[in-house]
Structures are given as C-alpha cells and as structure tokens.
C-alpha cells in the first residue's frame, strides 16, 4: 500500500524553517490550550457543561496520533505535541471524574494514573512494532493509526455538539480554550505544506479546526442571537407593566359586586337595600 506522505526526509524542504515555526506555534497552543479549562474547572469545582466522553476521546486519540507522528517522522514539534496534550487531557479527565462524577479522590487518581501507564506502554509497543513492519514494507498499520487518530480526535466533539443542541446554549466550555485549541490546529496544519505534506495529518488538523469553529458559531447563535430575541427590552417591560395595571383594574371591576354589575349610586343602593329588608320583614 502506498504511503500517505512523500519520501523526502523531514527538514530537507527549502521552507523547512517555516514548517518548524508553525509546528512549534501549534505545539505551544496545544500544550497550553487546556490550561484555561483546567483553571475554570478548579475555580468552579465543577465540570458542568463539559462532556466527559469529549475529554476521554481526546485522551484515547492522543495514542494513535502520537504513534502516527512518530513513525511518519514528522516535525519534532509535532512528535512532542500529542504527549504534552495528552498529559493535560488526563488532568481534565481527572477533574471530570472528581468534580463532575463525584468520584472519591483516591479512586479518580488510581484510574487516571493506571490509564496513563497503560497509554505509555501501548504507545511504545505500537511504535516499535509499526517501525519493524515499515522495514518489511508493511505500511497499512501506519495508515490505520492516522485514520484512527483523525476519527477519535474529531468524533470527540459529537457528544459536546449534542449537549449544546439539547441545552440550546454553549455552557461550561472555556472560549479561551477553544481559541487556543483551534489556533493550534491551524498552525499545525500550516506546518505541513512547508516541509512534508501528509494527507492524514492535514485532514486531522484541518477538520478539527473546522469543528471547533462550529462551536464558536453555535455559541454566537444560541448565547447571543437567540438569547437577545427572547429577552424583552425596557420598553417592552414598561408597556407590559402599564398594560397589566389596566387589566388588573378591568378584572377587578368585572368580579367586584360594586363593579360593572353594580351601576347604581351608593345612595340608591342603600335605599334599595332598606326597601328590600322592609318588604321581606314578617309582621
């Protein structure tokens, strides 16, 4: 099976310096992107609005992404990127278990640390095995890792999108986190044409950037446009209060004995009441 990349070794392209700069920018963004979200969760002692499966998918997706970037000998910054990103994703996942699911501290730590050790061992095994296969011209595992990374990274947003449409609002997500994350995806994508063009890596970073921009669009629609339409203005509130007073008086007149069904003056009413009592009085 043909490889999804060119055969030129990394760093030999005339614009390799530009590729390195963009890759470093992308790595820096991806390394710090979750920090605003982690701080937000810590201060609120809550992960409400942040889907646990969304974060877990990123933890899992970092495994094939790291393996793919390593065996494809991409830019050194892109090799380090998934490892640092996964460490922050593990931290956020711990917060989801501890704050969101209310797990005991020891249980949450045990699960996360065990998962981290398993992930590290699995990555090392896959990298060695796939590189051995490449020497024997078996390249389909490389393509599989690239496709798996692309699917897992991007499908992780599906539960988040479902939560957004159900709530008709974007809540619990740090916009700074999304801005940094989408910038990291964009810079990583831009690093590819300047050195080694990798189709699967381009699809991964490019599609992730588009999906994250979609969250911003939904936030503008639900949190700004629709919210403003459903919120009455000051003029509407003033008119409603005055109109409500008039309605209250009208309803009071209707249901009052001395209201619309009582049109006689008080003097006539008193005389009428006296005559009535006299008429029914038994001698």
UniProtKB/Swiss-Prot annotation:
GO terms for cellular component: cell division site; cell tip; Golgi apparatus; membrane. One of its GO terms (molecular function) is basic amino acid transmembrane transporter activity. InterPro entries: LAAT-1 (IPR051415), PQ-loop_rpt (IPR006603). Glycans are attached at residues 15, 228. SMART domains: CTNS. Residues 15-81, 149-204 form the PQ-loop domain. It is found in: Membrane. The keyword Transmembrane helix applies. The chain crosses the membrane at residues 19-39, 48-68, 108-128, 138-158, 170-190, 206-226. Keywords: Glycoprotein, Membrane, Repeat, Transmembrane, Transmembrane helix. Pfam families: PQ-loop. Signal peptide: none annotated. It is a multi-pass membrane protein. One of its GO terms (biological process) is amino acid transmembrane transport. This is Uncharacterized protein C2E12.03c.
């Amino acid at each position: 099976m043909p490889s999804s990349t060119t055969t030129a070794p990394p760093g030999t392209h005339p614009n390799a310096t530009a590729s390195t700069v963009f890759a470093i920018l992308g790595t820096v963004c991806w390394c710090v992107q979750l920090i605003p979200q982690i701080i937000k969760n810590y201060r609120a002692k809550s992960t409400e609005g942040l889907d646990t499966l969304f974060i877990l998918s990123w933890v899992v997706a970092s495994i094939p992404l790291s393996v793919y970037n390593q065996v494809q000998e991409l830019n050194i910054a892109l090799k380090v990127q998934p490892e640092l990103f996964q460490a922050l994703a593990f931290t956020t996942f711990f917060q989801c278990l501890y704050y969101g699911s209310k797990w005991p501290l020891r249980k949450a730590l045990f699960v996360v640390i065990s998962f981290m050790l398993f992930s590290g061992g699995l990555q090392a095994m896959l990298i060695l095995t796939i590189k051995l296969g490449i020497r024997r011209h078996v390249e389909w595992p490389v393509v599989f890792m690239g496709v798996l990374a692309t699917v897992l990274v991007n499908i992780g947003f599906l539960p988040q999108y479902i939560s957004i449409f159900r709530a008709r609002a974007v809540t619990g997500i740090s916009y700074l986190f999304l801005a940094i994350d989408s910038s990291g995806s964009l810079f990583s994508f831009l690093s590819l044409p300047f050195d080694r063009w990798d189709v699967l890596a381009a699809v991964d970073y490019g599609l992730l950037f588009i999906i994250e921009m979609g969250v911003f669009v939904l936030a503008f629609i639900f949190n700004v446009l629709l919210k403003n339409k459903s919120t009455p203005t000051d003029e509407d509130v003033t008119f409603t209060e005055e109109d409500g007073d008039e309605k209250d008086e009208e309803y009071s007149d209707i249901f009052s004995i001395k209201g619309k069904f009582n049109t006689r003056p008080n003097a006539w009413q008193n005389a009428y009441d006296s005559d009535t009592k006299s008429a029914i009085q038994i001698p």
